[in-house]
């Protein structure tokens, strides 16, 4: 436990700025309004009472004060339920919801400040050029190929959520010492949860929160996942044969500036509570060939060990969530499969490990004999069914893949319609260009091309054949031109940092800027 205590110890020498006073600064909400609210659900209703693209700092301050009042949220809910379609009460509901969302976006910007400052200072100190952080999206797959070729078993893991709101606040206490700000976050989350319990079912509460408060939800979710992964790093260190050797781990950094390398001492209490569990299992398995990678809420765990060893890691994950995060997670939700006969869906690809056998004749003097060799090949395939399902939800085709028109774009100009379809096609083509079999990708291009033609034909009340004849090669050129700005990810070189009482470890930060956002063009 002494080693765990040193691992979790936080560097208290860093001074953090007080963030709570910034909640009352107008430029914070201007930034939140410009970056986060223009495309939100509650942006349009504000035009009814004349705000349009404006807002009032005085109203934001007034709302913060009213949030602390005991009956504020309850009165808003009662007004909205009794008189939802009455002008005055409807405006009051939209007004309150709009500014509550603005506070959420402003708060998310504030809590990102300490992490952004530390990240910028790190790159300035190390003199790392920004261009060195940019890599092609396909740099990720050679890493998988290099590691999984020597693995035998793989597990698909869905990161569980939501956890209790108080746990989220406690996690942030490790990194932010601004007590008023954390108190306001706790109060806001508690009131928001109670408010929505009147309007929606508890099962949909986290879904609504993630949709209406995207930036804050991503920050809280990433802080929670970061906590899970740093404990995983600790367990991985304990289970290695070579205790002081370095290893690589991918940590996602999407809408979140940096994953901190230290954890707070307060969390040691939770570890001590379940000390018997950790002490009983930390030394019961040794696996120097464990590889873990995650994108958003899905993770893949691969190992060269036995099936029994994978079950050890499986129950290690389950107990971590149950005893440390107080989240009940069923073990059957983590599947263990043999990599040689299993395909897993990850980062938009169906990946599998194929075995290729070959026979070589070897001649030695007068004797000759045949040598059979088996090599592993990491194969990535375009998931046509999943892509057709996404296009079907976005109303570009039917469930069976039959192209249909997009009438919602009929008000746009012809060039804008073609440009949108072409951009989608180029993005998909670039992202899936690393596939070993591209027949499925050609089918997706055909669906988008014909859907574009049907949209234009419906707009001009003509036939598809007429427009294909009229545009012909021009339409084809638009759909098969390479994308000018390629998808990229921030993948810096291994970044060393020092844990308390240990040698340098290496963490790889993976930041996916965008993944074929085919359905987000409305």
UniProtKB/Swiss-Prot annotation:
InterPro entries listed in its UniProt record: Domain_X, Maturase_MatK, Maturase_MatK_N
Subcellular location: Plastid, Chloroplast
Keywords carried by this UniProt record: Chloroplast, mRNA processing, Plastid, RNA-binding, tRNA processing
Entry's Gene Ontology BP terms: mRNA processing; RNA splicing; tRNA processing
Domain of life (superkingdom): Eukaryota
Disulfide cysteine pairs (residue numbers): none
Annotated GO MF terms: RNA binding
Pfam families: Intron_maturas2, MatK_N
PANTHER family (UniProt xref): MATURASE K (PTHR34811:SF1)
Function: Usually encoded in the trnK tRNA gene intron. Probably assists in splicing its own and other chloroplast group II introns.
The protein's name: Maturase K
